[in-house]
Amino acid sequence: MQIYPLRLLPNKIDFDFMNFKAVSYSFSIILSLISFIWIGIYKFNFGIDFAGGIVIEVRLDQAPDLPKMRGVLGELGIGEVVLQNFGSERDLSIRFGISSEENLMKNIELIKASLQSSFPYKFEYRKVDFVGPQVGRQLIEAGAMAMLSSFLAIMVYIWVRFEWYFGLGILIALVHDVILALGFMSITKLDFNLSTIAAVLTIIGYSVNDSVVIYDRIRENLRKYHKKNITEIINLSINETLSRTILTVITTLLANLALMLFGGEAIRSFSVLVFFGIIAGTYSSIFISAPILTMFANRKFNNKVIER
């Protein structure tokens, strides 16, 4: 039995993506500048992981209903409250930020009273600690190093698999995606915490995967069509992979939509940022990383890529 691939678009689609190269570059530059300016003026809404706060360690007599507990504490109006199990499922860590020193003890007592009145558990409060912003700075540095390391590893991988020009194209696209993601996070006031660092790394991985698929087709078409110029080759390659690109982005967005709707407040920043990043990564793989290869369009470049 012959298996036919699922296609959303006709086989012979011929949309001239390269004709919009100048428009897409201008659009991306404008969005990047807006992101830079907004971040410079309004900064980020740093979560407890980076801004510091209070940590309450408590042991319960049974496993708690964490989603319900998050909902109850989230309605107290004291800002972000993070609940996590540690050790056993009966051990709970409650973290929240410090709005002011005057409200510190009041908020601690408010949390205790709310838990006691809303749940039938027995609570044994074991420790109350202050986590300073110094720890937050260390986490920011670690997150920045993680992103930088991923950039370098991706550059080396693309250089080995294709050619350094391709690595430069992907690097520009990734910087574009990260800037837009950070700008989106600042504009929407999403909590900047460890989960958003994971979201940015997820966006980087998705964007690279999309670009590599198009790059593979460009290399294949360079071998097949010796008389076509690089602009025609890139345009043909984007069109040939367009059905796959659309199917991938739809299925990924649907999976992420489930996280946004049912994942709860604990992963809200992660799921919303990844949703935006998937769209940005798809856009950059088509309109940034592929068209930018025309800057290196010469015969020597073509021969090097074909040999790989």
Curated annotation (Swiss-Prot):
GO terms for biological process: intracellular protein transmembrane transport; protein targeting; protein transport by the Sec complex. It comes from the Bacteria. The keyword Transmembrane applies. GO terms for molecular function: protein-transporting ATPase activity. InterPro entries: SecD/SecF_arch_bac, SecD/SecF_bac, SecD/SecF_CS, SecD_SecF_C, SecD_SecF_C_bact, SecF_bac, SSD. The chain crosses the membrane at residues 22-42, 140-160, 164-184, 194-214, 246-266, 272-292. It is a multi-pass membrane protein. Part of the Sec protein translocase complex. Interacts with the SecYEG preprotein conducting channel. SecDF uses the proton motive force (PMF) to complete protein translocation after the ATP-dependent function of SecA. NCBIfam families: 2A0604s01, transloc_SecF. This is Protein translocase subunit SecF. It comes from Rickettsia akari (strain Hartford).
